[in-house]
């Protein structure tokens, strides 16, 4: 039986980032063979990672990347905020979103799934890729990305289209695009425009509001008017274009788009947005 020295264990730890006990166990099982021990660690790690999948992973962070052809956001969860700051965790997320954006993929390849399991084994937490959003940047489009705070617990991507693409160099447009991303981070709209809201959802809300007014004693026509007003207000809360702009709530986002379009002499359109949040 091979004698496993502390120096051997230290060397394996430095090469794999695995724990002392796991390294010692792997070396013993491999008879002191370093390459075999690494394989044993991977096998042990994947098994233990799968056992951790039922543990809550309510922390994490959002990662982003853009290469002017595609852009994307990635939400990776973990169990503790301490791990969300771990350099191995951060490096994994940054590398993964770059690979996904550069390939245009919105799902993990087998090799990437294995990397995820190995990371979970090394850090010893339930780590999961929760959400992937990749978008293609078409002609006359550009994106603005905002990550909130040191731990990037909120990530926003806004894609805009400009009739005159040379205007994307305009500071007013760039500032407005960033303000839009900040707006989405602050108010978390669900839809871009009212037309995107499911008609069945609107009907359900109308029924709820009408039910609330059943005992009001008001006439049917007045109730209909009140319900219509409540629906309009509700849609303004969940639709980006109808929300009061975060830096000037006297104007809606739609009206701000028109104002900036006039100022730079080029029509601006919000093509889409994405909001990701930990928790």
Swiss-Prot record:
Residues 80-83 are annotated as: Involved in Mg(2+) ion dislocation from EF-Tu. GO terms for cellular component: cytoplasm. It comes from the Bacteria. Signal peptide: none annotated. It is found in: Cytoplasm. GO terms for molecular function: translation elongation factor activity. Disulfide bonds: none annotated. Pfam families: EF_TS (PF00889). Keywords: Cytoplasm, Elongation factor, Protein biosynthesis. Its main location: cytoplasm. Belongs to the EF-Ts family. Associates with the EF-Tu.GDP complex and induces the exchange of GDP to GTP. It remains bound to the aminoacyl-tRNA.EF-Tu.GTP complex up to the GTP hydrolysis stage on the ribosome. This is Elongation factor Ts. It comes from Borreliella afzelii (strain PKo). The gene is tsf.
